Amino acid sequence: MSNGGNAGKKSSSYFHFTAGLGSGILSAVLLQPADLLKTRLQQSNHASLLTTIRELSQSPNTIRSFWRGTVPSALRTGFGSAIYFTSLNALRQNVARSNLLRTIGVVDAKNGPVHSSSLPKLSNLANLTTGAVARAGAGFVLMPMTIIKVRYESNLYAYKSIMGAGRDIFLTEGFRGFFSGFGATAIRDAPYAGLYVLFYEQLKKRLSHIVHSVPQAEELVENLGVRKNMKGSTSASINFGSGVLAAGLATAITNPFDAIKTRIQLQPKKYTNLVMAGRKMVGEEGVKSLFDGLGLRMGRKAVSSALAWTIYEELIRRAELAWKGEEVIV
């Protein structure tokens, strides 16, 4: 999976699916409280974060209240990440192998600078496009689980179980109810994923260059025993830092679509489509309503995306080294 056409021979889609599944589930479980708080904030008219936390803390089972909806969230994020990373890798491999989008320059990593990643190196437009397409496809497949997750986390519905939530949605809204807000979700997720991959790859390249251009950093790398491929903790640190910054930027740009999407999924009868929902929210609550939950979403996305991508890249790196029979340097 390192650069270009031989990448697909070095690791199968199985590795990408498994790595994506594991990283997605782990990040979802750890960050479920932040996701639940974001949903509660976006469903109401500017309820404060402290008030929401206080209400959850006063429930009979505090831990269970904060981790409500963990199962659908873990399933959605886990399998969503698995599908996303698998399809993203396939798209990136095909672009690199067949020289698609060559007019805007597929990067030749063999002659390029040292990089913290073993994944294909593509141009900015290729990174933006493949990230957006892969996320839109994964989002459509996982949309029913997303609807159940959001409804189950919300206090607008008194669902006792995940199965009960799914049954009620089907009986009251039909099969179409499982895809409420897909337009807003796709408009949010596709640009977010595309921007994230674009920012992430650029930041990794720049941070890798800094590490090997600054004498002190170069000395530190040598002391760690890290060679040209930047294996081990240095690579993981660069990937994580790049992920945090990339997620923060992409989240801030796409948050209005996330706020609109949540309203459509929670109250589909009141907010029937993307345009109407946006106008209604701004008209009744002001522009600020489009940025409800931004702080929580930015914090959660920064950590979850960075964590998922760092774990994913590390698992793939180790799988490739094991595949080639090389020693794994941590």
UniProtKB/Swiss-Prot annotation:
Cell location: Mitochondrion inner membrane
Solcar repeats: 11-94, 122-206, 234-318
Catalytic activity: glycine(in) = glycine(out)
Functional note: Mitochondrial glycine transporter that imports glycine into the mitochondrial matrix. Plays an important role in providing glycine for the first enzymatic step in heme biosynthesis, the condensation of glycine with succinyl-CoA to produce 5-aminolevulinate (ALA) in the mitochondrial matrix.
GO cellular component, one term: mitochondrion
Protein name per its UniProtKB record: Mitochondrial glycine transporter
Membrane topology listed for this record: Multi-pass membrane protein
Organism: Sclerotinia sclerotiorum (strain ATCC 18683 / 1980 / Ss-1) (White mold)
Biological processes per GO annotation: glycine import into mitochondrion; heme biosynthetic process
Keyword Transmembrane recorded: yes
Alphabetical keyword list: Membrane, Mitochondrion, Mitochondrion inner membrane, Repeat, Transmembrane, Transmembrane helix, Transport
Family under the similarity heading: Belongs to the mitochondrial carrier (TC 2.A.29) family. SLC25A38 subfamily.
PANTHER family recorded: MITOCHONDRIAL GLYCINE TRANSPORTER
Keyword field contains Cell cycle: no
